Amino acid sequence: KRFWPADVHLVGKEIVRFHSIIWPIMLMSLGIELPKKIYGHGWLIVDGEKMSKSKGNVVDPIPLLQEFGSDAIRYYLLNDIQLGQDGNFSRERLINRINSDLSNDLGNLLHRSLSMVEKYRNGVLVHGDASVDPCIGEVSSEVEKNAEATLQRFRNGMDNWKINDALKAVWIFIRSLNKYIDVTMPWVLAKDEAKRAALDAVLYHLCEGMRFVSLMVEPVIPIAAEKIWAQLGLVDFEKANYENLVWGGIADGTKVAKGMPIFPRIEVEKEDLKAKVKSERKFNVKKTENDTSVPLI
């Protein structure tokens, strides 16, 4: 009952015929409700070639999960591969994606934001008043508009199974928040007591923006999303979701709790990278006429 009836029945493209004709007939004969939609996904290929046991290029996911974690693997696959299309897996691209998107963009934004809240406001958030500085007020208003617009683009992408487009929209917003820090320069505002309310507003906008981000990325990187939520000083993560997300959810007086980096940067030498790729490929057996490609599951 937890998994069926299904809104979407996701299958590999090579078995779409069975699951769209034979499977529904079997369900109907048993009086079981049919899925609302059947979606055939593509294959996962490696360096331009289909994964196959005979070629010995099947990548074992277990070592990858142990090394990088499920969040990073899930993000890479869903961001870099359009659902429904064949997608290329590359360990080098995986590491680059972790370092650029997850560590630099997302992780660095969270760390910078919370560090400034702790340094300048003893870890306590208040709404503040961006209007005391016209420039701060203008860019802060843009952050709010961008948050709402990003949420709508994210919803559209998820509803239409364009998960990579949904994630790209979120990362555009994340990068805009990093730019917001550079434009508003909280370290300068902190030196002027007359700009205290503006500083409070900037720090609040950063953390509220991160609250939006945490709920939008939760379907893809749930472990990291919950860590972000907790570091923002928020509770009841399991009750929150992006469907009813509106700006201004962080209450005045919320105390942040900066923690360890959610995605530490990965440093790997090229030669080590090549060795790792080779060691993670298994099933290196002689090619046979019954060679079958391994679909992305």
Predicted regions and their residues:
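Structured ligand/cofactor/substrate-binding pocket environments in proteins
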Residues: 1-75, 92-116, 200-218, 229-230
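Extended, non-catalytic structural segments that build the interaction scaffolds
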Residues: 10, 88-102, 149-168
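Surface-exposed helix-capping loop/turn segments at secondary-structure junctions
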Residues: 29-33, 115-126, 161-163, 219-223
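Short acidic/histidine-centered micro-motifs embedded in hydrophobic/aromatic stretches
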Residues: 41, 79-80, 169, 173, ...
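Catalytic adenosine-cofactor/nucleotide-binding cores of aminoacyl-tRNA synthetases and other
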Residues: 42-132, 235-270
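N-terminal alpha-helical segment
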Residues: 57, 87, 146-150, 209
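Conserved, charged catalytic cores of large soluble enzymes
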Residues: 110-154, 174-195, 199
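Basic, alpha-helical terminal appendages of large translation-related enzymes
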Residues: 156, 161, 171-297
